[in-house]
Amino acid sequence: ISEGFIITDPFLLYKPKKVVNTITYLTSKELFKLENHKFSQKRLEQVRDMFVFCCYTGLPYQEMSILTQKHIVKKFDGKLWIDMFRQKTKRQFSIPLLPKAISIIEKYQDDKRLLPVVSNQKFNSYLKEIAEIIGIEKKLTHHIARKTFATTVLLYNDVPIEVVSELLGHSKISTTQDHYAKVVQRKVSEQISTLSRKLDK
């Protein structure tokens, strides 16, 4: 343009394609396998329990590590919820406690904190051991628990994307849609297939 060879910028209307993130999470079979394995070492059992707890709450490591009894409240529905502030954004959030998460809290309720205290580095190191013992061929990190909560626990059980977005603490639903686009598409495909079979009858 500056040299006078062309009048308009040919890239002005060009919009790059969005890159769909590939997310790693545990399938329902892998999660079941993890939940039911008997560990001989207490440290691995504790980290497994903490990981599973996050699979059913979606808590990031920062929130999990400071969770105390004051964060557990009985709400309008008579059920227990986690009520606290995100360390990253300082936004308040609430997550209803599913039965499996409650059972893990009850297991460790004698502790000063609701869950054992393990550093983030050791946590991920122990997860690597756990994956090798159980035979999960994925690089297990704490972050995968949050992804598992969003996908295997919520989306694959037909929880609406709006609710998933709220429970993950996303400020915009578009953030959730971008992160979990492939999962949502797969669910839409499954539901349309089910609808097609019903309409064919």
Q: Across the structure, where does each feature detected by a protein language model lie?
A:
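Catalytic-site neighborhood detector that most strongly recognizes the C-terminal catalytic loop/helix
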Residues: Y25, R86-K90, L168-S193
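C-terminal catalytic core of Y-nucleophile DNA break-rejoin enzymes
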Residues: V20, R86-E129, G135
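C-terminal secondary-structure termini that scaffold catalytic or DNA-interacting sites
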Residues: T194-K201
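C-terminal catalytic core of tyrosine-transesterase DNA break-rejoin enzymes
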Residues: V52, Y56, Q62-E63, R146-S171, ...
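Short, basic (Lys/Arg/His-rich) helix/loop patches that form interaction surfaces
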Residues: Q41, Q109-R113, V117, S125-E166
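Basic, Lys/Arg- and aromatic-enriched nucleic-acid-binding interface segment
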Residues: I6-Y61, K79
